[in-house]
């Protein structure tokens, strides 16, 4: 493991739907709420998870492993992006936790991405997660979200 400081990105939103409904949207096959990516996994601990799509005109194929699932409260997985130009070794994988909590008649969704190599990349990741959560919250075309 490296002694280089690592960084964390966090994004949170409120969705005016119950956790079961948000979980269903989050895990729906073909739900392209993460940067328009196609997400493939069976959501079982130990299973692979892949994200494929286009980002600023570049094709990407990110990967990881599902670490934990507690429906409808937690999705925890590792993540590696070849676009990072980092070596594909465990030390360079992010850990991402998506937590759903009942909140004021809806759901508070918090995404935490850990083990990011630079402060600049952490800030960019936070922005991407805010965008992803906005997409998740507006999936039905409505305006049912507030960012915090």
Go through each PLM region and give its residues.
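Hydrophobic ligand-binding cavity/cleft-lining segments
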Residues: 1-40
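Intrinsic-disorder/low-complexity, polar/charged segments enriched in Ser/Thr/Lys/Arg/Asp/Glu/Gln
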Residues: 6-12, 48, 61, 74, ...
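A solvent-exposed, acidic/Ser-Thr-rich amphipathic alpha-helical stretch
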Residues: 19, 38-51, 58
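Hydrophobic pocket/interface hotspot
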Residues: 22, 49-51, 66, 77, ...
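Ser/Thr-centric signal marking residues that sit
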Residues: 27, 107-112
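Residues at helix-coil transition
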Residues: 27-28, 71, 138-142
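A conserved amphipathic terminal alpha-helix motif
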Residues: 92, 114-148
């Amino acid at each position: 493991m490296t002694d280089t400081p690592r960084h964390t990105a966090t994004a949170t939103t409120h969705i005016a739907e119950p956790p079961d409904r948000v979980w269903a949207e989050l895990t729906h096959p073909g739900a392209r709420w993460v940067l328009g990516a196609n997400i493939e996994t069976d959501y079982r601990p130990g299973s692979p998870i892949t994200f494929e799509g286009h980002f600023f005109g570049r094709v990407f194929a990110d990967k990881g492993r599902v670490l934990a699932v507690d429906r409808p409260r937690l999705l925890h997985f590792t993540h590696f992006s070849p676009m990072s130009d980092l070596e594909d070794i465990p030390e360079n994988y992010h850990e991402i936790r998506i937590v759903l909590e009942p909140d004021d008649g809806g759901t508070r969704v918090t995404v935490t991405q850990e083990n990011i190599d630079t402060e600049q990349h952490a800030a960019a990741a936070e922005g991407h997660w805010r965008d992803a959560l906005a997409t998740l919250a507006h999936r039905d075309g409505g305006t049912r979200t507030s960012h915090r």
